[in-house]
Amino acid sequence: RWDVDQCIYYCLNGVVGYSYTECQTMCT
């Protein structure tokens, strides 16, 4: 299973313009 914290980390660093909340929503 994809680790949520790791997903958020990669989302924040890899997806331009995404906020923490948006990454959290996408990753959970």
UniProtKB/Swiss-Prot annotation:
The keyword NAD does not apply. One of its GO terms (cellular component) is extracellular region. Disulfide bonds join C7-C27, C11-C23. It comes from the Eukaryota. Expressed by the venom duct. Keywords: Disulfide bond, Neurotoxin, Secreted, Toxin. Its main location: secreted. Signal peptide: none annotated. It is found in: Secreted. The keyword Disulfide bond applies. GO terms for molecular function: toxin activity. Belongs to the conotoxin L superfamily. The cysteine framework is XIV (C-C-C-C). In vivo, intracranial injection elicits scratching and grooming activity in mice, and causes body and rear limb extension and tail curling immediately upon injection. This is Conotoxin as14b.
